[in-house]
Swiss-Prot record:
Record keywords: Amino-acid biosynthesis, Aromatic amino acid biosynthesis, Lyase, Pyridoxal phosphate, Tryptophan biosynthesis
Protein family per UniProt: Belongs to the TrpB family.
EC number: 4.2.1.20
Catalytic activity: (1S,2R)-1-C-(indol-3-yl)glycerol 3-phosphate + L-serine = D-glyceraldehyde 3-phosphate + L-tryptophan + H2O
GO CC term (a single one): cytoplasm
Gene expressing this chain: trpB
Name of the protein in its database record: Tryptophan synthase beta chain
Cross-referenced InterPro entries: Trp_synth_b_CS (IPR006653), Trp_synth_beta (IPR006654), Trp_synth_beta/beta-like (IPR023026), TrpB-like_PALP (IPR001926), TrpB-like_PALP_sf (IPR036052)
Sites bearing N6-(pyridoxal phosphate)lysine, chain numbering: K95
Origin superkingdom: Bacteria
Pfam family membership, one: PALP
Cofactor(s) required, per the database record: pyridoxal 5'-phosphate
Lineage: Bacteria, Pseudomonadati, Pseudomonadota, Gammaproteobacteria, Pseudomonadales
Amino acid sequence: MTQSQYRPGPDANGLFGSFGGRYVAETLMPLVLDLAREYEAAKADPKFLEELAYFQRDYIGRPNPLYFAERLTEHCGGAKIFFKREELNHTGAHKVNNCIGQVLLAKRMGKKRLIAETGAGMHGVATATVAARFGLPCVIYMGATDIERQQANVFRMKLLGAEIVPVTAGTGTLKDAMNEALRDWVTNVEDTFYLIGTVAGPHPYPAMVRDFQSIIGKETRAQLQEKEGRLPDSLVACVGGGSNAMGLFHEFLEEPSVQIIGVEAGGHGVHTDKHAASLNGGVPGVLHGNRTYLLQDADGQITDAHSISAGLDYPGIGPEHAYLHEVKRVEYVSITDDEALDAFHATCRLEGIIPALESSHALAEAIKRAPKLPKDHLMVVCLSGRGDKDMQTVMNHMAAQEKQA
């Protein structure tokens, strides 16, 4: 496998190796083909790119900092740890990078209504935000379980004018919300734009979302060059569907000296049935329009994912991650709920930063690795979102621990 083959995809059929593709209902096929054409045209249009750059700068607040986490570095006693501060974006996470790109595309295509799925609620909030900014009605599909554990984000979406549809099917989480959003799209194909929140779904979504998120890695390269005069030695990011990770990784895939680590949600442990680690505990299959690694039972039925973090609670992973796993360019590991919580508390106390539980999975892996690495090793962790939304989850967990004590 030559280095130049790590960033080839997808091909014309939306495939990264054997992963990805367009597995959609016949009624949707013209729509995804049209979307792919429109996206290719937009990418080549200087006006579109100029407008995107304007909103990235003046609305999202980019570039965000690459911050040297000095006290965490001292605490670990090894590698020099940097945080790419995606939690400082408008709306508090990386999700808005993608939403602003897709809403500009929707506007360009003359669509009059936005729909989206959300798990932790951050993509829902970012979608509701851009819908408000561009005066478009917006419907968010959200699992009933997630609504329960993400009340603050539900209220934010309502404040921004979105309609929230609770999904009670299945486990009432992200997978089920995505199923309902796809049903809506089939029914309202003419005027509706489906704003997918991660690097999954039928082609062109995995590539399009990656491209809109790739600003994370591009900024990181320039910022580290300015600070240290060289490339990072390692990159660490959490992976649910995997958009913050693809955003950071893509820029560096052809740099053989850069070690890349994706961190899946290990839940209670990958050896149990309560985790969301599709690559470490799943097998290839088809879900939500693409072929990728999925959590499945012996009969090929999708099984329930579990993570303390609502944003990682998905039984699949973006197809480009599946490809990078198979060609061994990226190392995918898992972190348990407890390890993520420990890293969450450490980051709060050492850096005065309250990270999202999703990001805490990446932080936990960084804290594990850093002590074994030399002091001149440059490690970049993607701080994908802030932890305000997770206060109730952490409070409940701490209360449960106190009861057991």
